Amino acid sequence: GGGRASQAVFRVSRGPKSSADISGEIAFALADFVNSHTQAYADGKATAFTLASPEGGREPLMALKEWLSVGSDHDVFASGSWNIPVTYLHDWPDRYIHTTKDVAANIDPTKLKRAAFIGAAQAAILAGLTDGDGDTLVSLMGPNIVMRTGELMAQTSELGTDDRKAALRGHWSIEKRIRHSITSYVPN
């Protein structure tokens, strides 16, 4: 997903684990959707969503999904004081950031179009949720729960029993928080 000029990797970051929210699951699902369609496009396969600009690159997005990425203005709003769910779409590392070469000409129009799609689609989904969407949001969590649980098991494989149990308690607390956040968007 790195642009030719900046050689950066595109990332979809969600808020901190302390304020985990279903909006992050939606952002991750959209990243997977865009990754899949742009990979198909780059492979020369038919897709309804090429998400390519005539002036931009044709490579797949290959967006990485991650928890909170600190170091920008959104940190204040995502922190525990405000606790606002955030999705941060960004390139990192970007060799030109905060230099004299940090100019619009170094932004790949295709990557910008794809980022705009993810942001606009997430906003439209969140704004359009109805009482009947609760089960859909719960099912959206499934693949990410499996992925996160697998990552945790690998990360804690060499820990002692007590430390591993503590990590699992923290993990399931976060997953429960995400599940509970659905009621903020879909009351029933």
Residue ranges and their predicted role:
Residues 1-188:
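Secretory-pathway/membrane protein signature
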